[in-house]
Amino acid sequence: LSALQKQRVIYVLTHDSIGLGEDGPTHQPIEHVMTLRMIPNVELFRPCDIIETAECWTLAVENADKPSILALTRQNLPQLRTGGEMLSAKGAYRLKPADAERKVIIVATGSEVEIAMNTAKMLEEKGMGVDVISMPSWSRFLTQADEYRADLLPQDVLKVSIEAGTTFGWES
């Protein structure tokens, strides 16, 4: 109803991940993230660390005519970047540029960004250049200029997504 009424409501959801499984399969919401993204006039944020969480909270407060959802994990996650420019405002950004010629781009959201960073490190140790893109908000990323989106996700590079959920939607 808050989406239909264009209300500024901020929903804070926790336990967003299968990373902590001791609560059992009823607490592993693998389909929920994509389902929430599909609701019209709702912005879903899935931050990867405390910096992104603070940025996404600020963006949610600024959403005057629609509800926002912050999907947070219960896992202890590392801080992946320091402050500075509010990178989450673009929906996605290059968290880690390739150290060698870029061969792969890993796009990840939320707690899986840490997995992407660890994977990139392993691949780069084998000589493969890997960018890591953190995407806290799909909807914001899709509103960016074509040039920005093409710079982050060029056509001529292998792209891999990591999100603990359904693969629906990632094909785009």
Name every feature range the model reports, one short phrase each.
Residues 9-13, 19-29, 53, 62-172:
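Thiamine diphosphate
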Residues 34-35, 160:
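Two-metal-ion acidic nuclease core segments, chiefly of the RNase H-like superfamily
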Residues 3-16, 35-38:
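A glycine-rich helix N-cap at a beta->alpha junction
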Residues 1-5, 28-30:
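Catalytic alpha/beta active-site cores
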Residues 48:
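TRNA-recognition modules of translation machinery and tRNA-sensing kinases, especially anticodon-binding
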Residues 3, 37, 61, 153-154:
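Alpha-helix boundary recognition
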